[in-house]
Swiss-Prot record:
Primary gene name: HSP90-7
Function description: May have a molecular chaperone role in the processing of secreted materials. Required for shoot apical meristem (SAM), root apical meristem (RAM) and floral meristem (FM) formation, probably by regulating the folding of CLAVATA proteins (CLVs). Also involved in pollen tube elongation. Involved in resistance to tunicamycin- or high calcium-induced ER stresses. Possesses ATPase activity.
UniProt organism field: Arabidopsis thaliana (Mouse-ear cress)
One term of GO molecular function: ATP-dependent protein folding chaperone
Protein name stated in the entry: Endoplasmin homolog
Coiled coil (residue ranges): none
Subunit structure: Interacts with FKBP42. Interacts with P23-1.
Length: 823
C-alpha cells in the first residue's frame, strides 16, 4: 500500500514540473523566431546559492537568456561613446595598466567614492541613508562561475540616468570630479577621483559590462556596453530593486577565468584595498559539518517483501505512536556567507596617542607579512600638514634581510607602500625614500597627492619631493630617538641617574642591535645624501682605542678629545685586532690620543665624503699630514738625519717613494710607509685590487706617492745613519735599507709587488746572522743512474737467457757489481 502511494506522489510532482517547462520552451521558441531582442520578464525567484547573485537581504535576479547573449536591450536608449573606442581601449589596455589585476582596485575605489559621497550628505541629512540594509555603508563582491559573472556592489550615492550617460559615456569625465567641484567649499570630502578612466579598466577582463544604479532622486537604471563604440541606458524593471547604490556586473572573458576564484579575489583585495574605509565582503563558500536524518536505503523497498509481517506491524505501530526515534548522521556541507576581507584597521588615521604598543606591533606584522613574535625596534607615526598633507607610519624591522646589500642599487624593495585615500597605489618606486632607507617598512597615505591618469605611474611632481623630504627627516629622527633612549648610549656622567631610576630596561642595547643590522645603511646615506650628511653622521657608531669594545659616537669622541687636539683621528683596516697592532698608533696611544677604528670596506668610501664634523677635520693616521703636537728636538733631528734621508730617498727612486722624512707617529717601530693625503690608503689599495673588474691603470694613478717615515730614536736607524756617514756606497747598507723599506711596506698594510725579491733579501740577512757566506748556495742534487728494471723481471729475463744458452743466470746484484769492477 505504501509503495503505491509513493509512486502516485512522484507522478504528480513530475506533472507539476513539466507544465512550467513547456512554457519556457514556448518562450524560447518565440525568442528564436524574433529578429529583435525583447526585454526579459521579471523573475521573482531568489537566488541564494553559490551560483546566484543575491542573499535574503540583497536580492539580485539572474539574467535572462537574452542577456546571456550579451546584446543590448531592444527598448534601451542607444548612445555612442564620445571618444573613439579604439583609442580608448588602446590607452586603457596598452598604455595605462601594466597588469589586469588592478581592475578590481579601480572598481572598489569607485565604490568607496560613492560611499564617501552619501556619508558626507548624511552629515546634514540622515534621511538620505534610508533604513535597514540600505543604510549599511559597505561593498559586496559576488561571483557566478556558471555564467562567468563577477559583481561588485556598493550602497553609495548611486547614479541617475543623466549621471550614467555623462560619467560612463565620456572619457576623462568623472562623477567624483563634478562632486568635488560642487562641494569643495563644504569640508573634507575624502574622495578618490581625478581619473575618469578607472571604470574602463574593467574591459581588461570583461567583454560585456552592466551597471545597475539607483539614486535617491531617480528610478533604477541599467547602463550596458560591449565597448564596441556604443552603450545603452534603460530603466530597470526586471532586476531586484537596489534601494540605493550601484552594482557592476562583469561578464568575464574566457581568458579571465582566474577572477572567478575566491582565493584570487581575496588576494587582490588584501593587496590593493585592505585599508578602504568601508567593509568589503565576499560571498564565500566554506565547509561545515551538519547533522541530517538518515534516509532509508533504496534497497529497502526491495527487501520489504522478505520482511516478516510481524516486523511491519511493529514498525507501523511505532510510527503511529510517534515513538520511533529518528537517526541522524554528520555530513560535510558547503555553505555560503559574507566574509569580511579588510579587517585590519587603518591605525594611521587615528591619533598616535590613541594607538597602543600592541596595536602598532600587530599592524607591523600585518603590513610586513612578518608573523614572528619579534617586535619592531622602533616606529614613527605622524601627520604632515601644509601644502601636501599625508599620514605615515614607519617601522624599523627587528632584523635586516639576508640580501639587503647584495643588489643594493638594482633591487626594488617593496617595503614602503603608497596609498591615496586608503587605496593602494604602488610599492615599487624610489620617489618617497632613498635607497639607503629602503630597509624601513611602512605606509604613506596622501589625501592631496596629485596623480596622472594612471595610478601606477606617479608624476614627477613637487608634492612627491615634499613628501620625501619629510619622510627622510622623520625616519632619521626615529633612529636618533632610538639611540637617545638606549641606556648604553648615555654618557658616563648620566648613567648613574638612569641606573637608579631603572627606566628603559627594555630599550637597553637596542641601538647597538640596530647598528649591527643596519649600520651600513647609515654609512651609505652619508655617501649618497649630502643634504642630510650631518644628521646621519650623528648616527655613526664605531669602536676606538678607548671604547673598551663598546660602540661610541662622534659626539662622545669629541667630548673626550684632548684640549690641544684639533683633528678627529681614525685608521682603516680589515679588523680591529690588526689595527690595534698598527705602528701608526704607537705614539698617539702613548700620548693619550683616541683613534677611531674603521674596519668595514665601505668605510674607505665613507671617509672620502665625510670630511669634517662639528668644525673638526678627519685625519687618517696612516696618511701624511698628521699633527700630534710639536717636539722641541724636531729641527735638531731633521738636521742630524738629513744625510740619511737624502741618501735613502735616492736609493728608493725606483720604488715610487716621494720622500723620506722624520716621523712624528712612531715610538717602537724603526720605519713605516705612509701615503699622500689624497691618495689611496693601504687598506683601500687592498680593497681595489680584490675587485674583479678593477682598472690597473687607475690603480697606479690613485695609489699616489708614498713617503717613508723613519724613527730617529730607533737603534737600527741610528746605526744606518752612522754607516752612511762612513761609507754611503756600502752594498750591505744598501741591501739593509732596501729590506727595511720592504718590511715597512708589509707592516704598514701594503701588498708587495715583488715578494720574491723580498724573500731573497730575508734569506741573505739570515745567512749573515748565521755567518754563512753570501755566495753560499744549496748543494746540487746528484743525478742518480737510471734504475734497472725490477729484480723479478730481470731474474725472469736472466733465467730465460740462461735456459736458452744452457748456462746458470747470475743474480742481478752480482751483475751490477761486475759492471762496476769493469769500469
Amino acid at each position: 500500500m505504501r509503495k503505491r502511494t509513493l509512486v502516485s506522489v512522484l507522478f504528480l510532482f513530475s506533472l507539476l514540473f513539466l507544465l512550467p517547462d513547456q512554457g519556457r520552451k514556448l518562450h524560447a521558441n518565440a525568442e528564436e523566431s524574433s529578429d529583435d531582442v525583447t526585454d526579459p520578464p521579471k523573475v521573482e525567484e531568489k537566488i541564494g546559492g553559490h551560483g546566484g547573485l543575491s542573499t535574503d537581504s540583497d536580492v539580485v535576479h539572474r539574467e535572462s537568456e537574452s542577456m546571456s547573449k550579451k546584446t543590448l536591450r531592444s527598448n534601451a536608449e542607444k548612445f555612442e561613446f564620445q571618444a573613439e573606442v579604439s583609442r580608448l581601449m588602446d590607452i586603457i589596455i596598452n598604455s595605462l595598466y601594466s597588469n589586469k589585476d588592478i581592475f578590481l582596485r579601480e572598481l572598489i575605489s569607485n565604490a568607496s567614492d560613492a560611499l564617501d559621497k552619501i556619508r558626507f550628505l548624511a552629515l546634514t541629512d540622515k534621511d538620505v541613508l534610508g533604513e535597514g540594509d540600505t543604510a549599511k555603508l559597505e561593498i559586496q563582491i559576488k561571483l557566478d562561475k556558471a555564467k562567468k559573472i563577477l559583481s561588485i556592489r556598493d550602497r553609495g550615492i548611486g547614479m541617475t540616468k543623466e549621471d550614467l550617460i555623462k560619467n560612463l559615456g565620456t572619457i576623462a569625465k568623472s562623477g567624483t570630479s563634478a562632486f568635488v567641484e560642487k562641494m569643495q567649499s563644504s569640508g573634507d570630502l575624502n574622495l578618490i577621483g581625478q581619473f575618469g578612466v578607472g571604470f574602463y579598466s574593467a574591459y581588461l577582463v570583461a567583454d560585456y559590462i552592466e551597471v545597475i544604479s539607483k539614486h535617491n532622486d531617480d528610478s533604477q537604471y541599467v547602463w550596458e556596453s560591449k565597448a564596441n563604440g556604443k552603450f545603452a541606458v534603460s530603466e530597470d524593471t526586471w532586476n531586484e530593486p537596489l534601494g540605493r547604490g550601484t552594482e557592476i556586473r562583469l561578464h568575464l572573458r574566457d581568458e579571465a577565468g582566474e577572477y572567478l576564484e575566491e582565493s584570487k579575489l581575496k588576494e587582490l583585495v588584501k593587496r590593493y584595498s585592505e585599508f578602504i574605509n568601508f567593509p568589503i565582503s565576499l560571498w564565500a563558500s566554506k565547509e561545515v559539518e551538519t547533522e541530517v536524518p538518515v534516509e532509508e536505503d533504496e534497497s529497502a523497498d526491495e527487501e520489504t517483501e522478505t520482511t516478516s509481517t510481524e516486523e511491519e506491524k511493529e514498525e507501523d505501530a511505532e510510527e503511529e505512536d510517534g515513538e520511533k526515534k529518528q537517526k541522524t548522521k554528520k555530513v560535510k556541507e558547503t555553505v555560503y556567507e559574507w566574509e569580511l576581507l579588510n579587517d585590519v584597521k587603518a591605525i594611521w588615521l587615528r591619533s598616535p596617542k590613541e594607538v597602543t604598543e600592541e596595536e602598532y606591533t600587530k599592524f607591523y606584522h600585518s603590513l610586513s607579512k612578518d608573523f614572528t613574535d619579534e617586535k619592531p625596534m622602533a616606529w614613527s607615526h605622524f601627520n604632515a600638514e601644509g601644502d601636501v598633507e599625508f599620514k605615515a607610519v614607519l617601522y624599523v624591522p627587528p632584523k635586516a634581510p639576508h640580501d639587503l646589500y647584495e643588489s643594493y642599487y638594482n633591487s626594488n624593495k617593496a617595503n614602503l607602500k603608497l596609498y591615496v585615500r586608503r587605496v593602494f597605489i604602488s610599492d615599487e618606486f624610489d620617489e618617497l625614500l632613498p635607497k639607503y632607507l629602503s630597509f624601513l617598512k611602512g605606509l604613506v597615505d596622501s589625501d592631496t597627492l596629485p596623480l596622472n591618469v594612471s595610478r601606477e605611474m606617479l608624476q614627477q611632481h613637487s608634492s612627491l619631493k615634499t613628501i620625501k623630504k619629510k619622510l627622510i627627516r622623520k625616519a632619521l629622527d626615529m633612529i636618533r630617538k632610538l639611540a637617545e633612549e638606549d641606556p648604553d648610549e648615555i654618557h658616563d656622567d648620566e648613567k648613574k641617574d638612569v641606573e637608579k631610576s631603572g627606566e628603559n630596561d627594555e630599550k637597553k642595547g637596542q641601538y647597538t642591535k640596530f647598528w649591527n643590522e643596519f649600520g651600513k645603511s647609515v654609512k651609505l646615506g652619508i655617501i649618497e645624501d649630502a643634504a642630510n650628511r650631518n644628521r646621519l653622521a650623528k648616527l655613526l657608531r664605531f669602536e676606538t682605542t678607548k671604547s673598551d669594545g663598546k660602540l661610541t659616537s662622534l659626539d662622545q669622541y669629541i667630548k673626550r678629545m684632548k684640549k690641544s687636539q684639533k683633528d678627529i683621528f681614525y685608521i682603516t683596516g680589515s679588523s680591529k685586532e690588526q689595527l690595534e697592532k698598527s705602528p701608526f698608533l704607537e705614539r698617539l696611544i702613548k700620548k693619550g690620543y683616541e683613534v677611531i677604528f674603521f674596519t668595514d670596506p665601505v668605510d674607505e668610501y665613507l671617509m672620502q665624503y665625510l670630511m669634517d664634523y662639528e668644525d673638526k677635520k678627519f685625519q687618517n693616521v696612516s696618511k701624511e699630514g698628521l699633527k700630534v703636537g710639536k717636539d722641541s728636538k724636531d729641527k735638531e733631528l731633521k738636521e742630524a738625519f738629513k744625510e740619511l734621508t737624502k741618501w735613502w730617498k735616492g736609493n728608493l727612486a725606483s720604488e715610487n717613494v716621494d720622500d723620506v722624512k722624520i716621523s712624528n707617529r712612531l715610538a717602537d717601530t724603526p720605519c713605516v710607509v705612509v701615503t699622500s693625503k689624497f691618495g689611496w690608503s693601504a687598506n683601500m689599495e687592498r680593497i681595489m685590487q680584490s675587485q674583479t673588474l678593477s682598472d690597473a691603470n687607475k690603480q697606479a694613478y690613485m695609489r699616489g706617492k708614498r713617503v717613508l717615515e723613519i724613527n730617529p730614536r730607533h737603534p737600527i736607524i741610528k746605526e744606518l745613519k752612522d754607516r752612511i756617514a762612513s761609507d754611503p756606497e756600502d752594498e750591505s747598507v744598501k741591501e739593509t735599507a732596501q729590506l727595511m723599506y720592504q718590511t715597512a711596506l708589509i707592516e704598514s698594510g701594503f701588498i708587495l709587488t715583488d715578494p720574491k725579491d723580498f724573500a731573497a733579501r730575508i734569506y741573505n740577512s739570515v745567512k749573515s746572522g748565521l755567518n754563512i757566506s753570501p755566495d753560499a748556495v744549496a748543494d746540487e742534487e746528484i743525478e742518480a743512474a737510471e734504475e734497472p728494471e725490477t729484480s723479478e723481471a730481470t731474474e725472469t729475463k736472466s733465467d730465460d737467457l740462461a735456459g736458452g744458452l744452457n748456462i746458470e743466470a747470475e743474480p742481478v746484484e752480482q751483475q751490477e757489481e761486475n759492471t762496476k769492477d769493469e769500469l
